[in-house]
Amino acid sequence: KGYVFKIMGGCDKQGFPMKQGVLTPGRVRLLLYRGTPCFRGYGRRNGERRRKSVRGCIVSPDLSVLNLVIVKKGENDLPGLTDTEKPRMRGPREPQRSEALYFKEDDVRKYVNTTAEFTTKWKGSKAPKIQRLVTPLTLQRKRARIADKKKRIAKAKSEAAEYQKLLASRLKEQREKRSESLAKKRSRLSAASKPSIAA
């Protein structure tokens, strides 16, 4: 008594989902884009639409599942629903998502949701892996990565400078050889042309 629920969705007996904004108690076929409710559309092309059967959002007896959310709690507890407290396991796995909860210097691992101990063979606690956690080890790896990159850039620059120097010396040698050969050729031609002039 006193509970207020909000209808969030549901399915009829054939498994067709309810769609918000379709004000009919039956089924309709709508052209839906990928990613819209009632059409996940994996493997579709960009902008492709498909005609899918969806059920209207009006509640009727032909529904098999109705999803509700408690908006306002009533006087008494509902057995199995509001009288038991279930642990919240699905916390944020990325520290960036939960920066409002912690400071950057804090160790986020202390605040991670963990499961309760098992009463069967194995006793312990399970915790989700935190992605992109900034620890001293990750910072050390980042520094090492940056230092390695700088070292590689410096090595590449020095090798490029050496190569340019070698290339310049080779080009200079080629020019000298060519000028020598041209000088020899000219001297031969001039030597060959002198007797003919004298004659």
Curated annotation (Swiss-Prot):
Pfam families: Ribosomal_S6e. Gene3D superfamilies: 1.20.5.2650. One of its GO terms (molecular function) is structural constituent of ribosome. It comes from Nicotiana tabacum. Component of the 40S small ribosomal subunit. Plays an important role in controlling cell growth and proliferation through the selective translation of particular classes of mRNA. Keywords: Phosphoprotein, Ribonucleoprotein, Ribosomal protein. GO terms for biological process: translation. This is Small ribosomal subunit protein eS6. Residues 172-183 have a biased composition (Basic and acidic residues). The keyword Ribosomal protein applies. Residues 172-199 are annotated as: Disordered. The keyword Membrane does not apply. Ribosomal protein S6 is the major substrate of protein kinases in eukaryote ribosomes. Belongs to the eukaryotic ribosomal protein eS6 family. One of its GO terms (cellular component) is ribosome. InterPro entries: Ribosomal_eS6, Ribosomal_eS6-like, Ribosomal_eS6_CS.
